[in-house]
């Protein structure tokens, strides 16, 4: 087996995470957390400290769909965090929603240093979480229900129908949506 440098190992993680590496990710695969800080300091332009415990590998290109920014928002909020509501609909291009903000739910208290485009809320106990495109997310069905008072009914119905056509909503979930949204 070929020996990999810490840099190579961290790049592998970053390639799977839209260019991002957390100190926790590094620790889990045997890279001492201090190595990230050393690489960020020493190797200018390769690894950049984004926030506490979060680094970006600058050799990994930004995702052209904008998913890198969404992944960063979730990672900044910490483990167990996920996108919800309008951000889930925006991720799938299901409805015209405000892309200026990324809505993230977190089980932990807010970090004071979050950028203003990240809107953090307390995660609901027992929330059903999944992953879309490798990004932790509320289910599309629950995002539709959450957006009932934020998006006009006709646009929300259109989003639900589009999600169903794309296979993002299961048949049993669709029955619940039809009943709840009176479709």
What is the predicted function of each stretch?
Residues 1-80, 112-117, 174-175, 180-183:
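Short beta-edge/loop segments at beta->alpha junctions of small alpha/beta modules
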């Amino acid at each position: 087996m070929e020996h990999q440098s810490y840099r190579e190992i961290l790049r592998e993680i970053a390639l799977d995470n839209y260019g991002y590496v957390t100190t926790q990710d590094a620790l889990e695969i045997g890279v001492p957390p201090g190595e990230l800080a050393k690489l960020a300091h020493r190797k200018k332009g390769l690894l950049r400290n984004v926030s506490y415990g979060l680094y970006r590998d600058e050799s990994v290109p930004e995702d052209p769909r904008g998913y890198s920014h969404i992944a960063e928002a979730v990672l900044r909020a910490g483990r167990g965090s996920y996108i919800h509501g309008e951000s889930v609909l925006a991720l799938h291009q299901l409805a015209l929603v405000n892309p200026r903000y990324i809505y993230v739910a977190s089980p932990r208290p807010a970090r004071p240093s979050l950028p203003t485009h990240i809107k953090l809320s307390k995660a609901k106990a027992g929330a059903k979480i999944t992953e879309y495109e490798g990004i932790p997310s509320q289910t599309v069905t629950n995002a539709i229900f959450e957006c009932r008072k934020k998006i006009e009914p006709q646009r929300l119905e259109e989003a639900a129908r589009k999600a169903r056509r794309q296979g993002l909503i299961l048949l049993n979930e669709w029955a619940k949506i039809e009943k709840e949204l009176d479709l």
